[in-house]
UniProtKB/Swiss-Prot annotation:
Pfam families: RNA_pol_Rpb1_1 (PF04997), RNA_pol_Rpb1_2 (PF00623), RNA_pol_Rpb1_3 (PF04983), RNA_pol_Rpb1_4 (PF05000), RNA_pol_Rpb1_5 (PF04998)
The name this protein goes by in its record: DNA-directed RNA polymerase subunit beta'
Record function comment: DNA-dependent RNA polymerase catalyzes the transcription of DNA into RNA using the four ribonucleoside triphosphates as substrates.
Cofactor(s) named in the record: Mg(2+); Zn(2+)
Co-factor binding comment: Binds 1 Mg(2+) ion per subunit. Binds 2 Zn(2+) ions per subunit.
Keyword S-adenosyl-L-methionine: no
Length: 1413
């Protein structure tokens, strides 16, 4: 029977394809798809339920309703296959064809396609060079359009109203031709000469110089060239034939009760057909023009609604007043075709259940409930039952399984053996959210999960559910086992730290075991080996924490690399000695000989992984877990009220704080401080008091008094349960303990401001009603924040994945020697991230040379692993140039050397690894841990931030950076006059140890090359004011400084001294008052000039400056001329957390961005305009560049100052686009990486830099053509970098001029939408716009990325899929070569083709042959 069925199966050929092209369909093409014209709007007969003939469900056009059965029932059964019934006209075939056969409607009047009309920018408008408004008037029959002017002075494409048309007709008769409606538009499109238009436009482009015009022309040129290249005729944008979707894709389903549920499309099609038929009839009847016009307009509207309902005018609604879902709505949005069905599918062979903990499991196992396994593995069980002869048919087997015969369970055990299943916990934020395990059958209905993988899944056992999936094919099982098994994924791909780190009970147990206790039972006993310790412990002679001495066996490698046992004596504790049993060999006992806190255990597992390999580490982690659980149980640690010790000093501290607050209140009431200052001070006092109570409490908790062996009183670390839990990292933190036993402290109001009365009680004492009420707000806000955060974080991840999804490692080495120099990250003199952490796992770009001996220590192209990084540290290299994804020269994808180590595997990255997606997941996954709020810096918060001096942290020599400029004043002090001055401290080897920024006007207390001790002051400054320092000496001459006009006199009430303050000038009668400034005059009465130029020194003062010199006063170099109070700086909102990360990746320009100098040159000020000041920079060639700066901005430079290109000249946050333009890609990358890292570092999240670099590479993947040279581009066009480089290679090979370009920084959303793959862009956002554009350009999608391939249903070109695609392409090339060779043999006299082609192809490996490495 089966063989018989196979005979009748139609041969469905698997189409192999390499690209998908999208275009416009010509009317002929649409007719060729069609199986017949739909003439009637009827659907099915309401009595017989049979489809009406020529209707929307017609069986003649679309195929039979039942398999192999015509409609009237004359032909049934397979034997009539392919017969067309003469009675009802239906072909006898499978009913499945109703899903693929299309019909068509011949439109009585042409109709413009709404996408090309209304999708902005309007493509029709661009081609015709008319405004959208005009085209709409023509299309919807409100105006006439001249098609052929003939001999008249009218222009082609001119728009005329009805009255105009009548007037012109009277004037010229029928010398000209004008039409209205889609016919007019179609005629215009048909008669357009694209080649000529392109020529003219190219000519205009060369001739014009106005920016706006160039932009406009190049846009139009691009569209026209698209038509030219793709061979699509513009008049196809107007349809004469409308295709009809196959009926099974717009089904009509009978509901019970004789009603029908139908797809909205049927309604929309019915309207089109009705109006079209009416129009046909009117045309036959030769109805008056005005009626026809109305009918044509209605037809146009009906077709518009079918294609994209609601795009123009009011949306068509059904009977129940809801908008009908049109064809465009079917594909776009979250529930559209792309995101609902193509990118996310539901899968068979899956189940979900609650998870419980399975501490007895090994790391690679999970507990699967028997009933679930029975259901999931049904087909395998059926197969097995048949093979064993226990069941003859599937049906019988089904019966056996359903009755749950004992034999079935045995078979289930067999089937499940070595068959991994995949577990997934939603939300799957990174690749560790799905892992494979070997199932172990268990009773019950809950899945058991190994405790160590919880961190990776972010799972807990408070009711979480997980889904199980079964990989079916052998290949799938193999991949699940080798790539996804939990024991093969022990490192986080985000940062290379172990992911199987014990937590909570396990940590507590291990910590409790490895602590020491002074004077424990049996202290100081010597033991021969661990077994003896175990006996003594079992007999109660010693406690776990007793200090003892014991002989332990360790394993070390000898010269031959064999393991040799070594016995050493260690002073340790009983617990540690017993734990030493589980150490893998290769780790010395010293790693265990300390109290194991969570960080220590993580480091221990990391060390084990690097030294002993994966297998031993997994076994070790499992044993650690078992011991931890056992010991925590044995330890019997619990919490009691008594453990929360309230510090005795609490009352004293609170009383003291209360007194200080009263004092401040008194000052306020006598008017000495303002209310704002009083509030700030009060908040400050209570904040400090809270910290003091917390400190006192921790001191009391952390230690306890004991008597040691010699009878002395000593303090030891406490065994208080709460303290142990926090200290070990098992649960809780100092801040939480402070609320339990200290005081709760200050609370925030709903608007974010701090309530000035703190909660002085703690949870042990209990809160009163008011205190409880105050604290409710904060608790609720936390919950609301979390919900918002999750959604935002998910959206950020989606955008990141979308922009990087096509980035895959495609080759081993691109051969570049470019890279970025890495140094240790230093901020405020402290090393935040040492050099070793930054270069670990990267590849050296150039040889690394020992600074002392000048010998090459590490050659270029070496992967820097732990040992090499240690070597670099030892040798004393402080700057290493490493390869980075940003400088990789691979065209599509990345090379393995530029990426470096695969952090999730700990080895060199493999070709085919989807590093883009991994980067996106690594950045998006911790997103939910980031905060959502915007911080207001001001008041109490900023006071702590005011520094007024820098000190060295280490001994060394001072070195001034090249940017550091200073003058020496009369007292011999050095005064800094550079904006970006830096000062470094070098150690004896000349390595930079620390680096400090020195602000403008600071007094530098050390000289270049001075030796300093740690703690030396380097520079001091006044934190509250910013000085203006004179760089030259002379007598002061005031200009434009008039009291009451530009300055005001302020008298200090306390001291009686008066100062001049610069105010906003009052303009009198339109006379513009110059800005107040001073010139310096030398002894001869001439203006002092700036050294090396003939500019006079003039120093202008900003509004709010306090002038400290008098007119005519002699000033020396380095003297302060004026001070600008810093209080006047407004409180800035600092965007933090998730919004800040999104802002950086979207490359948004900040609201009031700072300005960077466009050129290197000298600053001067021009004439001010209204509300703006004019700043001029004269470059070295003497060309001046002007900038207008709003008055309220703070200018950081003054007259005569020399600035470097890219230096800050106006205060404010930096704009990434400016950084890219003025300082280049490297600076931009550093800026984005550092800023993103700052946000994550604040939350204690570790992410490797290279992930952020990968994203930045994708943001920089487009370039802007400035000069096309001889290449095939348009000026101002944005193209993919790889496309540009390929084109330039081609042009250079022909000895022509390559195109010049600028780098462009795109935000991640923009970058995703501007990708070359239209499928990927359409499935991301703005589907209609993307598809419209792609169709006109006749775009071809080469299916390079992962997303496109998922959508078309192929294996993705990453991992094992990449190998598959490469092999497939090789095979195709080989077959082509063989065909070519065969053709040559058959016809030897034909001209020989170029031999090179064939040679290249034949040198590919043949089947069964492996390519030589």
């Amino acid at each position: 029977m089966k063989a018989l069925l196979d005979l009748f199966k139609q041969v469905s050929q698997d189409e192999q394809f390499d690209a998908i092209k999208i275009g416009l369909a010509s009317p002929e093409k649409i007719r060729s798809w069609s199986y017949g014209e739909v003439r009637k709007p009827e659907t099915i007969n309401y009595r017989t339920f049979k489809p009406e003939r020529d209707g929307l469900f017609c069986a003649k056009i679309f195929g039979p309703i039942k398999d192999y059965e015509c409609l009237c029932g004359k032909y049934k059964r397979l034997k009539h296959r392919g017969v067309i019934c003469e009675k009802c006209g239906v072909e006898v075939t499978v009913a499945k064809v109703r899903r693929e056969r299309m019909g068509h409607i011949e439109l009585a009047s042409p109709v413009a396609h709404i996408w090309f009309l209304k999708s902005l920018p309007s493509r029709l408008g661009m081609v015709l060079d008319m405004t959208l408004r005009d085209i709409e008037r023509v299309l919807y029959f409100e105006a006439w359009c001249v098609i052929e002017p003939g001999m008249t002075p009218l222009k082609r494409g001119q728009i005329m109203s009805d009255d105009d048309f009548l007037a012109k007709t009277e004037e010229y008769g029928d010398d000209f031709r004008a039409l209205m409606g889609a016919e007019a538009v179609r005629e215009l499109l048909r008669t357009i000469d694209i080649d000529r238009e392109v020529e003219t436009l190219r000519g205009e482009l060369k001739a014009t110089s106005s920016e706006a015009k160039i932009k406009k022309i190049s846009k139009r040129l691009k569209v026209l060239e698209g038509f030219q290249k793709s061979g699509i005729k513009p008049d196809w944008m107007v349809m004469e034939v409308l295709p009809v979707l196959p009926p099974d894709l717009r089904p009509l389903v009978p509901l019970d009760g004789g009603r029908f549920a139908t797809s909205d499309l049927n309604d929309l099609y019915r309207r089109v057909i009705n109006r079209n038929n009416r129009l046909k009839r009117l045309l036959e009847l030769k109805a008056p023009e005005i009626i026809l016009r109305n009918e044509k307009r209605m037809l146009q509207e009906a077709v518009d609604s079918l294609l994209d309902n609601g795009r123009r005018g009011k949306a068509m609604t059904g009977a129940n007043k809801r908008q009908l879902k049109s064809l465009a709505d079917m594909i776009k949005g979250k529930s559209g075709r792309f995101r609902q069905n193509l990118l996310g599918k539901r899968v068979d062979y899956s189940g979900r259940s609650v998870i419980v903990v399975g501490p007895q499991l090994k790391l690679h196992q999970c507990g699967l409930p028997k009933l679930m396994a029975l259901e999931l593995f049904k087909p395998f069980i059926f197969n097995r039952l048949e093979m064993m002869g226990l069941a003859t048919t599937i049906k019988a087997a089904k019966k056996l399984v359903e009755s749950q015969e004992p034999v079935v369970w045995d078979i289930l055990e067999e089937v499940i053996r070595e068959h991994p299943v995949m577990l997934n916990r939603a939300p799957t934020l990174h690749r560790l959210g799905i892992q494979a395990f070997e199932p172990v059958l268990i009773e019950g209905k809950a899945i058991q999960l190994h405790p160590l993988v919880c961190a990776a899944f972010n799972a807990d056992f408070d009711g979480d559910q997980m889904a199980v999936h079964v990989p079916l094919s052998l290949e799938a099982q193999l991949e699940a086992r080798t790539l996804m098994l939990a024991s093969n994924n022990v490192l986080f791909p985000a940062n290379g730290e172990p992911s199987i780190v014990p937590s909570q009970d396990i940590v507590l147990g291990l910590y409790y075991t490895t602590r020491e206790r002074i004077n424990g039972r049996g202290e100081g006993i010597f033991f021969a080996d661990v077994a003896e310790v175990q006996r003594a412990y079992d007999n109660g002679e010693v406690e776990l924490q007793t200090r003892i001495t014991v002989r332990l066996k360790e394993h070390e490698r000898d010269e031959q690399g064999e393991w040799q046992p070594v016995i050493r004596r260690h002073e340790t504790t009983v617990g540690r000695a017993l734990l030493s049993e589980i150490l893998p060999r290769g780790l010395p006992f010293t790693v265990l000989n300390k109290a194991l806190k969570k960080k220590e255990i993580s480091r221990l597992i990391n060390q084990s992984f690097r030294r002993c390999g994966l297998r031993d580490t997994v076994i070790f982690a499992d044993k650690l877990m078992q011991s931890g659980f056992r010991l925590a149980t044995r330890g019997g640690i619990s919490i009691a009220m008594e453990d929360m010790l309230i510090p005795a000093a609490k009352e004293v501290i609170l009383a003291e704080a209360g007194r200080e607050v009263k004092e401040i209140d008194k000052q306020y009431s006598s008017g000495l401080v303002t209310s704002q200052e009083r509030y700030n001070n009060v908040v400050d006092i209570w904040g400090k008091a809270g910290d003091k109570v917390g400190k006192a409490m921790m001191e009391q908790l952390a230690t306890e008094p004991v008597v040691n062996r010699h009878g002395e009183n000593v303090r030891q670390e406490s065994f208080n349960s709460i303290y142990m839990m926090a200290d070990s990292g098992a649960r809780g933190s100092a801040a939480q303990i402070r609320q339990l036993a200290g005081m709760r402290g200050l609370m925030a109001k709903p608007d974010g401001s701090i309530i000035e009365t703190p909660i002085t009680a703690n949870f042990r004492e209990g809160l009163n009603v008011l205190q409880y009420f105050i604290s409710t707000h904060g608790a609720r806000k936390g919950l609301a924040d979390t919900a918002l955060k999750t959604a935002n974080s998910g959206y950020l991840t989606r955008r990141l994945v979308d922009v990087t999804q096509d980035l895959v490692i495609t080759e081993v080495d691109c051969g570049t020697s470019h890279g970025y120099s890495m140094k240790a990250l230093v901020e405020g003199g402290e090393v935040i991230e040492p050099l070793r952490d930054r270069i670990l796992g990267r590849v050296a770009a150039v040889d690394i040379v020992n600074p002392d001996t000048q010998e090459t220590e590490i050659t270029a192209g070496t992967l820097l692993d732990e040992d090499l990084v240690d070597l670099i540290d030892r040798v004393g290299v402080d700057e290493v140039k490493v390869r980075t994804p940003l400088t990789c020269e691979t065209r599509h994808g990345l090379c393995a050397h530029c990426y470096g180590r695969d952090l999730g595997r700990g080895s060199h990255v493999n070709v085919g690894e989807a590093v883009g997606v991994i980067a996106a997941q690594s950045i998006g996954e911790p997103g939910t841990q980031l905060t959502m709020r915007t911080f207001h810096i001001g008041g109490a918060a900023s006071r702590s931030a005011l520094a007024s001096a820098v000190e060295t942290k280490s001994n060394g020599t001072v070195g001034f950076a090249s940017t550091m400029r200073y003058v020496t004043n009369a007292k011999g002090e050095r005064v800094a006059i550079s904006r970006s001055g830096e000062l470094a401290i070098y150690d004896d080897n000349g390595r930079e140890r620390e680096r400090h920024k020195i602000p403008y006007g600071a007094t530098v207390l050390v000289g270049d090359g001075d030796a300093v001790k740690a703690g030396t002051r380097l520079a001091t400054w006044d934190p509250l004011t910013r000085p203006i320092v004179s760089e030259y000496g002379g007598a002061v001459r005031f200009e434009n400084i008039e009291e009451g006009v530009t300055v005001a006199k302020q008298v200090d009430e306390v001291t009686g001294l008066s100062t001049l303050v610069v105010i906003t000038p009052k303009t009198r009668g339109g006379k513009v008052v110059m800005r107040p400034q001073i010139k310096l005059v030398n002894d001869n009465g001439e203006d002092v000039r700036i050294a090396g130029t003939d500019h006079a020194v003039n120093i202008s003062f900003p509004v709010g400056a306090l002038i400290t010199v008098r007119d005519g006063q002699q000033v020396a170099v380095g003297e302060v001329l004026a001070r600008i109070p810093q209080e006047s700086q407004k409180t800035r909102d600092i965007t933090g957390g998730l919004p800040r990360v999104a802002e950086l990746f979207e490359a948004r320009s900040p609201k009031d961005a700072g300005m960077l100098a466009e050129v290197t040159g000298t600053v001067s000020f021009g004439k001010d305009t209204k509300g703006k000041q004019r700043l001029v920079i004269t470059d070295l060639e003497g060309i001046s560049h002007e900038f207008l700066i709003p008055k309220e901005k703070q200018v950081l430079v003054h007259d005569g100052q020399v600035v470097n290109k890219g230096e800050m000249i106006v205060d404010g946050p930096a704009d990434p686009h400016d950084i890219l333009r003025l300082q280049g890609i490297e600076k931009l990358a550093t800026y984005i990486v550092d800023e993103v890292q700052d946000v994550y570092r604040l939350q204690g999240v570790k992410i490797n830099d290279k992930h952020i670099e990968v994203i930045v590479r994708q943001m920089l993947r487009r370039v802007n053509i400035t000069d096309p040279g001889d290449a095939d581009f348009i000026p101002g066009e944005q193209v993919e970098r790889s496309e540009l480089l390929n084109e330039n290679d081609r042009v250079i090979a022909e000895d022509k001029r390559p195109a010049q370009y600028d780098n462009v920084l795109l935000g991640i959303t923009k970058a995703s939408l501007s990708t070359d793959s239209f499928i990927s862009a359409a499935s991301f956002q703005e589907t209609t716009r993307v598809l419209t554009e792609a169709a006109i350009m006749g775009k071809r999608d080469d299916l390079r990325g992962l997303k496109e391939n998922v959508i078309v249903g192929r294996l993705i070109p990453a991992g094992t899929g990449l190998a598959y695609h490469l092999a497939r392409k090789d095979k195709e090339a080989l077959e082509a070569a063989e065909r070519e060779a065969a053709r040559q043999q058959a016809n030897p006299f034909e001209e020989m083709p170029v031999a090179a082609d064939i040679e290249v192809d034949v040198s590919l490996p043949f089947e069964g042959e492996t390519p030589a490495e």
